[in-house]
């Protein structure tokens, strides 16, 4: 084999190798906006969305960027689901029971007073078809849900009147 043949074959191999290079290098960066129902100072909850966005960026070598926006920056805190439904933002970080007024079933997608504890909720979501059932429900609202954390059993209760004394008869 002469030198010209080697150079020609190496050139062909180089062109072929370039042609089969991963398409990921040619893809444009995807940029999504995440509207949160939570303010920045609530770092235990709001911060979870920031950590999520950072991890997605790291796992995609920066090709999928999520900008996280606190409550009120892009829309009202309790309007983030409407924002996703209308296409104003691509993602929301919220708690389903905030949307109880749309449908009472929104309440069971998160901790509720006297409801499941964190282990029970995780077991139901991942082993008891809870995620599947919730997404069947959310599909009616043009939504897809991914559990994004678990704060445990609801801290406190939901009452019609402000509690000012230890007298529980007035709230029962």
Where are these predicted regions, by residue range?
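Contiguous mixed-secondary-structure segments that line small-molecule binding/active-site clefts
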Residues: 54, 85, 95-172
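Immediate post-signal peptide segment of exported/extracytoplasmic ligand-binding proteins
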Residues: 20-37, 57-65, 139, 162-170
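Extracytoplasmic "Venus flytrap"
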Residues: 33-50, 71-75
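Short, polar/charged alpha-helical segment
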Residues: 42-67, 129
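Extracytoplasmic small-molecule ligand-binding "clamshell" domains
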Residues: 66-84, 118
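N-terminal secretory signal peptides and thylakoid transit peptides that target proteins
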Residues: 1-14
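Alpha-to-beta junction loops
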Residues: 62-64, 80-97
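Structural recognition of the beta-strand scaffold that forms the well-ordered cores
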Residues: 33, 66, 91-94, 144-148
């Amino acid at each position: 084999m002469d030198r010209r043949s080697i150079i020609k074959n190496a050139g062909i191999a180089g062109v072929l190798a370039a042609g089969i290079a991963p398409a990921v290098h040619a893809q444009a960066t995807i940029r999504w906006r995440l509207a949160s129902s939570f303010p920045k100072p609530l770092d235990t909850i709001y911060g979870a969305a920031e950590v999520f966005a950072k991890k997605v960026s790291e796992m995609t070598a920066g090709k999928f960027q999520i900008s996280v926006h606190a409550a009120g920056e892009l829309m009202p805190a309790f309007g983030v689901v409407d924002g996703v439904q209308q296409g104003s933002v691509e993602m929301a970080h919220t708690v389903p029971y905030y949307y109880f007024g749309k449908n009472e079933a929104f309440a069971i997608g998160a901790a509720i007073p006297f409801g499941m504890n964190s282990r029970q909720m995780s077991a139901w979501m991942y082993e008891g078809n809870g995620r599947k059932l919730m997404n069947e429900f959310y599909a009616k609202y043009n939504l897809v849900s991914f559990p994004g954390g678990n704060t445990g059993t609801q801290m406190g209760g939901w009452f019609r009147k402000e509690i000012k004394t230890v007298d529980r008869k007035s709230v029962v």
